[in-house]
A protein has these predicted regions:
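Short, basic/glycine-rich phosphate-binding loops at helix/coil junctions
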Residues: 49-63, 110, 132, 211-220
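Conserved, helical-rich catalytic subdomain that frames metal- and/or nucleotide-binding sites
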Residues: 54, 143, 147-248, 263-288
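Contiguous, small/hydrophobic- and glycine-enriched helical/loop subdomains that border
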Residues: 111-156
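Hydrophobic C-terminal alpha-helix "anchor/cap" residues
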Residues: 34-37, 131, 241, 275
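Glycine/serine-rich anion-binding loops at beta->alpha junctions
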Residues: 89-118, 136, 247-262
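A generic local secondary-structure boundary/capping motif
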Residues: 32-34, 128, 158-164
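ATP-binding N-lobe of GHMP and related small-molecule kinases
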Residues: 1-98, 116-125, 146, 150, ...
Length: 288
């Protein structure tokens, strides 16, 4: 049996994110395109002698006592009946509170790592049950590999249909460094005058639109307008990327990272070389 495992947790971008009307239970359904990108958190999961223990060490980032890693550990133990103790060391590279799914991806990575560590393969039903108790975006990150880099996502995030991922997407990301909780962001969307607007791309056409030239995309993000209204830093990021001649500019998730998509790697690299001097957190990335 292994005594430790290393796992990587990729970030994601929402290329499109429509927030639907609030449901009777107070939650919202979404319609979205999720895209994994090669920016990773790294986790070292080690066995410890004590049972029913999940110790989390995060040297570069302060985590609350209860977090997605501990939630994933508890969910794994509940599904499998295993109660072995572990220590998880998290090396954080995905910006926090950025809309890039870092916490959810970390949770999925813990489930995967624990499966390897204890030699137990979770069934699809067990994975679904565990993900539902950790977070809505966890479902997208449950599978890894080229076949699982892009998906059409709906419901609260639990309905994931993987699609062929494009390899010709060239991103520049700007991190404004502001944060609004997910609850606050949804409240802003609910109060925003465009909350009920019809999407430019019907849900059943999202995959087809994804395959078109980026300059022809009619995607949008329901969070972008209200969050940009609240935070001038987000407005600045959107403006800077638009002025850099990106073919498509959008915010991911409920913010606050903003990304631009460029027609070529050269165009993206040139924009990055200019923007990195005025933005402390600026990234040049491609689709995985």
């Amino acid at each position: 049996m292994l005594s430790s495992v290393h796992v990587k947790a990729p970030a994601k971008l929402n290329l499109h994110l429509k927030v639907c009307e609030k449901r009777d239970d107070g939650f919202h359904d979404i319609e979205s395109i999720f895209q994994k990108i090669p920016l990773y958190d790294e986790l070292l999961i080690e066995m410890v002698d004590s049972s029913c223990t999940c110790q989390v060490i995060s040297p570069d980032f302060t985590l609350p006592f209860e977090n997605t890693l501990t939630s994933a550990y508890k969910a794994f133990c509940s599904c499998t009946g295993i109660n072995g103790g572990v220590r998880i060391t998290l090396k954080k590279r995905i910006p926090s509170g950025a809309g890039m799914g870092g916490g959810s991806s970390d949770g999925a990575a813990v489930l995967s790592g624990l499966s390897k560590l204890f030699g137990v393969e979770l069934t699809p039903e067990q994975k679904h049950k565990a993900a539902s108790s950790v977070g809505s975006d966890v479902f997208f990150f449950l599978e890894d590999g080229d076949r699982y880099d892009a998906a059409v996502v709906s419901g609260r995030g639990e309905n994931v249909r993987y699609i062929n991922s494009r390899k010709d997407l060239y991103f520049v990301l700007l991190c404004p460094g502001v944060h609004s909780s997910t609850g606050e962001a949804y409240a802003l969307v609910d109060s925003w005058h465009n909350v009920n607007r019809a999407g430019n791309t019907p849900f059943n056409e999202l995959e087809d639109m994804y395959g078109k030239p980026v300059s022809e995309w009619t995607f949008y993000n329901s969070f972008t307008e209200p969050l940009a209204w609240k935070f001038p830093e987000i407005r600045k990021a959107l403006s800077d990327l638009q002025q850099s001649d990106a073919d498509y500019v959008q915010m991911t998730g409920s913010g606050s990272v903003v990304f631009g998509l460029f027609a070529s790697a050269e165009d993206a690299r040139n924009a990055y070389d200019v923007l990195k001097d005025s933005w402390a957190e600026c990234y040049y990335l491609t689709s995985r």
